[in-house]
């Protein structure tokens, strides 16, 4: 326990526009310390500085409040809320299907995981989990694993940039563009596509989808090897990451940390293995771990996880080739959002063929389509918790229904929010420069933290 005698005599707070006062106070302290005996009296001076929320090294609008003594961090706290968008509250005023458009924008670097967790929750409430077409589940897995690779590439790129490895940033974003191009081909959008829907996916793969993915599978392994050759044995990279941001298994369990940070302690915890969903139990892949408990171990885990994701994508491509023509949306027309939309010749709206199919199939089908789009599906009352393994850890959703066409409550357990609790444990007692490394190894996304 800290006693009053151990506390600093004076704390100087640096806000943003008070630098002149800080300099003046520091000079006064320096002058007084020249007197006999004053040096020892002021030896414990501390300064509180704000790193962020505009700092380029804080992964968005994260504010780190650091109390430093010299170059040593004595206390570290996180200031969040600068990117609050009220998504969870907005979901209470939208239909169950419209909610996908909102949740995909939370953790904007891994949108397919947000969508999948949401849809799995809705499907569990509806009791149709086992009725989802296999082809739709395979597409979900493929899109999530491609998304995992793109998210890890951003983590390595931004982490490298913050430590001065600009080449890593260029390589990471270059390879990510290849994956975003695949997303655009399949969903029409590079990010935030709302492609995964309750009951399946919005549309089947286009003709050019699988060939583009096959080309990606031949190119990415070589590109990833380039990044490994650049950083794995790089003297400066290892000096900045080895032993930095240390957090052991006890600390992770106490704070509820998941994802690469937890697996860097040697614990092989991965929901794809321990609580499989979307048929993950039928895929062949390994859970990557490391026992260093530091930033370098987390870097290695992300690099190796990308290779495991490529293995899963290869298996998905093989299954999709065998299931061409199979449905990608649940067959119950009272629940199924139309999954065969086609763009008209003007590039807007739906094609005449699609409209004719809806209106000419049956009067009952037209009524169901109208009610589905205007009112939305009715979900039986109840509550569920569903979790998926996102690039940052356990992404959970607690969903409550009161039997209506809109959620009563949807709460997300975002791993970025939970993992930020580790900042103090990782940074306190270390150098200011090492705080950058520690935060980069957590890889928080503030859209998911603040929601």
From Swiss-Prot:
Protein location: Cell membrane
Superkingdom of the organism of origin: Bacteria
Reactions accelerated catalytically: a quinone + NADH + 5 H(+)(in) = a quinol + NAD(+) + 4 H(+)(out)
Gene name of the record: nuoD
Similarity field: Belongs to the complex I 49 kDa subunit family.
UniProt xrefs under NCBIfam families: NuoD, PRK06075.1
Keywords carried by this UniProt record: Cell membrane, Membrane, NAD, Quinone, Translocase, Transport
Sections of the chain in a coiled coil: none
Any one annotated GO CC term: plasma membrane
This protein's name: NADH-quinone oxidoreductase subunit D
Enzyme nomenclature, EC number: 7.1.1.-
Membrane topology category: Peripheral membrane protein
Assembly behavior: NDH-1 is composed of 14 different subunits. Subunits NuoB, C, D, E, F, and G constitute the peripheral sector of the complex.
Function: NDH-1 shuttles electrons from NADH, via FMN and iron-sulfur (Fe-S) centers, to quinones in the respiratory chain. The immediate electron acceptor for the enzyme in this species is believed to be a menaquinone. Couples the redox reaction to proton translocation (for every two electrons transferred, four hydrogen ions are translocated across the cytoplasmic membrane), and thus conserves the redox energy in a proton gradient.
One Gene Ontology molecular-function label: NAD binding
A UniProt-annotated Pfam family: Complex1_49kDa
UniProt KW Membrane keyword: yes
């Amino acid at each position: 326990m800290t006693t009053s005698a151990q506390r600093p005599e004076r704390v100087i707070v640096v806000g943003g526009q008070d630098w002149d006062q800080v300099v003046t106070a520091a000079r006064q302290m320096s002058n007084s310390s020249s007197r006999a005996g004053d040096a020892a009296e002021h030896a414990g001076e501390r300064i509180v500085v704000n790193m962020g929320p505009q700092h380029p090294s804080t992964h968005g609008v994260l504010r780190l409040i650091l109390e430093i003594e010299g170059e040593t961090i004595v206390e570290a706290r996180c200031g969040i809320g600068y990117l609050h968008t009220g998504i969870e509250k907005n979901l209470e005023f939208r239909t169950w299907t419209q909610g996908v458009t909102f949740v995909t924008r939370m953790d904007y670097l891994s949108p397919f995981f947000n969508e999948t967790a949401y849809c799995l929750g809705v499907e569990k409430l509806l009791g149709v989990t086992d009725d989802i077409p296999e082809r739709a589940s395979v597409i979900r897995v493929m899109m999530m694993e491609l998304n995992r690779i793109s998210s890890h590439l951003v983590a390595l790129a931004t982490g490298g940039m913050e430590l001065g490895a600009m080449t890593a940033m260029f390589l990471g974003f270059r390879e990510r563009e290849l994956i975003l191009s695949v997303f655009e081909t399949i969903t029409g959008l590079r990010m935030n596509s709302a492609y995964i829907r309750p009951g399946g996916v919005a549309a089947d793969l286009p003709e050019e989808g699988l060939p583009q993915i096959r080309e990606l599978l031949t190119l990415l392994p070589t590109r990833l090897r380039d990044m490994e050759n650049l950083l794995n044995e790089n003297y400066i990279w290892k000096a900045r990451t080895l032993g930095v941001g240390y957090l052991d298994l006890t600390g992770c369990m106490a704070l509820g940390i998941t994802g690469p940070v937890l697996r860097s302690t040697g614990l092989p915890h991965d929901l794809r293995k321990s609580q499989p969903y979307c048929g993950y139990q039928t895929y062949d892949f390994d859970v990557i771990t490391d026992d260093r408990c530091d930033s370098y171990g987390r870097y290695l885990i992300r690099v190796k996880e990308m290779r495991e994701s490529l293995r899963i994508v290869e298996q998905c491509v093989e299954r999709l080739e065998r299931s061409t023509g199979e449905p990608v949306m649940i067959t119950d027309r009272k629940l199924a959002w139309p999954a065969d939309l086609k763009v008209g010749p003007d590039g807007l709206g739906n094609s005449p063929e699609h409209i004719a199919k809806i209106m000419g199939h049956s009067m009952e089908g037209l009524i169901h389509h109208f009610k589905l789009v205007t009112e939305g599906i009715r979900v039986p009352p109840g509550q569920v918790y569903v979790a998926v393994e996102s690039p940052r850890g356990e992404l959970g959703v607690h969903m409550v229904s009161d039997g209506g066409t809109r959620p009563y409550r949807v709460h997300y357990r975002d791993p970025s929010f939970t993992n930020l609790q580790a900042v103090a444990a990782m940074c306190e007692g270390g150098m200011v420069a090492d705080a950058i490394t520690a935060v980069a190894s957590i890889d928080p996304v503030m859209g998911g933290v603040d929601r």
